[in-house]
Amino acid sequence: MSDAVTKTVAPLRRKANPINGKHTNGVTIDGIFDDHNRQIGPINSQMEDIAQKTDDGGGGEWTSKASFMTWTMHDIIYVARHHWIPCLFAAGVMFFTVVEYTFQMTPASSQPFDLGFVATRYLHSILASSPNLNTVLAALNTILVGMQTTYIGCTWAVEGRPRATIAALFMFTCRGILGYSTQLPRPQEFLGSGVDYPVGNVSFFLFYSGHVAGSMIASLDMKRMQRFRLAMVFDILNVLQSIRLLGTRGHYTIDIAVGVGAGILFDSLAGKYEEMSKRHLRNTRCSLISKDSLVT
């Protein structure tokens, strides 16, 4: 490294909102750079910059203006162009707020309205008029459940990776608690089958779909292990499974939607549990080593 070292202090940038693509409020970069412009010194945090401001002591300009008062038309255009997904969700909030306050609630004497049932009414009529086809699709669906269960179990028993198994345990336990807590009525047009899972056409919890959540957990693990083709097959089968469940009235749309979210959520929680366990194990080993060094 060259002996010639220069210290560069960037000035305080005053831009109201970090989402506008420019510098954030109150970020001062105080670093030391060598001749090749490589940083070799520390970077001050935003909180340190706030503490180092030397105005009138009461906050001054820092608190005199709210963030929105510094927004410009350029900022609004930038957000609309580069952050269109949050803008789309904002429009969705406004739209469904209007919908929620203008629609009448479904009477207690009526069956719940389900948009998925409306979309699959043609499939429902076909399956209702063809019990053999319904039985074949139910058997294929049960095979898919067996495939995902086998895969999730093998990730732990064969490959020694417990994350997917832990996620499935979390997911089915939570599903049992929620399903028992709120026992939704079975749809009147339900088309059962003796080979469907749960086998024997027994009673089952509707909220949420364990079929869909289990397939999501298996698919996420496949993608994590870069088994992308197998994951794509599972995703396609999961979509077909969801359509079949709606067509047979085996689940409401909300059960399937939450099943997708539950698979993602519990896979993430299982990953955090693994990280926490590894961190605890490392800390335990370090404490044991330090104890041994003190004894010796």
From Swiss-Prot:
Query: What are the catalytic residues?
Result: H211, H251, D255
> EC number(s)?
2.7.8.-
One cellular component term (GO) for this entry is: membrane
Protein's UniProt keywords contain Disulfide bond: no
Which portions of this protein are annotated as coiled-coil regions?
A: none
Q: Superkingdom of this entry's organism?
A: Eukaryota
What's an example Gene Ontology biological process for this entry? phosphatidylcholine metabolic process
Q: Keywords in UniProt for this one?
A: Lipid metabolism, Membrane, Transferase, Transmembrane, Transmembrane helix
Q: What are the GO MF terms of this UniProt record?
A: diacylglycerol cholinephosphotransferase activity
Protein location = Membrane
Residue spans crossing the bilayer: 83-103, 136-156, 165-182, 198-218, 250-270
Q: How does it sit in the membrane?
A: Multi-pass membrane protein
Statement: the UniProt record of this protein carries the keyword Membrane: yes
Q: Tell me which family the UniProt entry assigns to this protein.
A: Belongs to the phosphatidylcholine:diacylglycerol cholinephosphotransferase family.
| Matching PANTHER family | PHOSPHATIDYLCHOLINE:DIACYLGLYCEROL CHOLINEPHOSPHOTRANSFERASE 1-RELATED
What does it do?
Functions as a phosphatidylcholine:diacylglycerol cholinephosphotransferase that catalyzes the transfer of the phosphocholine headgroup from phosphatidylcholine (PC) to diacylglycerol, a major reaction for the transfer of 18:1 into phosphatidylcholine for desaturation and also for the reverse transfer of 18:2 and 18:3 into the triacylglycerols synthesis pathway.
Name this polypeptide is given: Phosphatidylcholine:diacylglycerol cholinephosphotransferase 2
